Amino acid sequence: MNRRRRIYEGKAKILYEGPEPGTLIQFFKDDATAFNKKKHDVIDGKGVLNNRISEYIFTHLNKIGIPTHFIRRLNMREQLIKEVEIIPLEIVVRNVAAGSLAKRLGIEEGTVLPRSIIEFYYKADALDDPMVSEEHITAFGWASPQELDDIMALAIRINDFLSGLFLGVGIQLVDFKVECGRLYEGDMMRIVLADEISPDSCRLWDIETKEKMDKDRFRRDMGGLVEAYQEVARRLGIINENEPPRGSGPVLVK
């Protein structure tokens, strides 16, 4: 991979040029970040698990007709993806009050919301990814009204699928974050799901115990992040029931 041109490096992934025009290679790092990189560790094995879990979810989404950038997994840390023009928004779908929503509105964490809520955040680390409205999005040209309709329709379908998928293995989907992009195919353009879906980008609670099985374990210094991600992968049937934990836990990066 060192011989390939690096296109972009984010908090948890690196994009390299792909083997064919219109493709990229997405590499999953072991970096764990929170609060827009104010907190940063490297946790051995996290990237491998996120790659496997995201592959599993994107493959199933493709099968049910939800368009994504995913082509196939190449190895333990890399995926082949379609090159898209990323829309500078984080789309958050919330089913249960947690995190910033609970704090912002004074709702007790764990309260089931009257209905699923979609929120938008402008992707700008320097501004701490501010929450924005549909009016902001269309006024500043980040997405057109039609694109916004497409994004919201995708988000609702993804939420329906993920909620059922996780419910079937005893996990409650509290909320999740996705990103979308414009995929150009000849003269045609369509909105597709991009980035990843993994315990890094979802809040996942055990239905019975309410044990957190996501990146909140890192945000809140609870420990056991890799073990929690492994348990998600085991329940989904992605890794063997008896596969031993990878790595030796978090390593602080100075």
UniProtKB/Swiss-Prot annotation:
Keyword entries, A-Z: ATP-binding, Ligase, Nucleotide-binding, Purine biosynthesis
One Pfam family cited in the UniProt record for this chain: SAICAR_synt
PROSITE patterns, A to Z: SAICAR_SYNTHETASE_1
Cystine residue pairs: none
One Gene Ontology term of the molecular function aspect: ATP binding
SUPFAM superfamilies: SAICAR synthase-like
Reaction(s) this enzyme catalyzes, per UniProt: 5-amino-1-(5-phospho-D-ribosyl)imidazole-4-carboxylate + L-aspartate + ATP = (2S)-2-[5-amino-1-(5-phospho-beta-D-ribosyl)imidazole-4-carboxamido]succinate + ADP + phosphate + 2 H(+)
EC number(s) recorded for this UniProt protein: 6.3.2.6
Entry's Gene Ontology cellular component terms: cytosol
GO terms for biological process, alphabetical: 'de novo' IMP biosynthetic process; cobalamin biosynthetic process
Origin superkingdom: Bacteria
Pathway: Purine metabolism; IMP biosynthesis via de novo pathway; 5-amino-1-(5-phospho-D-ribosyl)imidazole-4-carboxamide from 5-amino-1-(5-phospho-D-ribosyl)imidazole-4-carboxylate: step 1/2
InterPro entries the record matches: SAICAR_synt/ADE2_N, SAICAR_synt_PurC, SAICAR_synth, SAICAR_synthetase, SAICAR_synthetase_CS
Sequence similarity: Belongs to the SAICAR synthetase family.
Name of this protein: Phosphoribosylaminoimidazole-succinocarboxamide synthase
Source species taxonomy: Bacteria, Pseudomonadati, Pseudomonadota, Alphaproteobacteria, Hyphomicrobiales
Gene (UniProt): purC
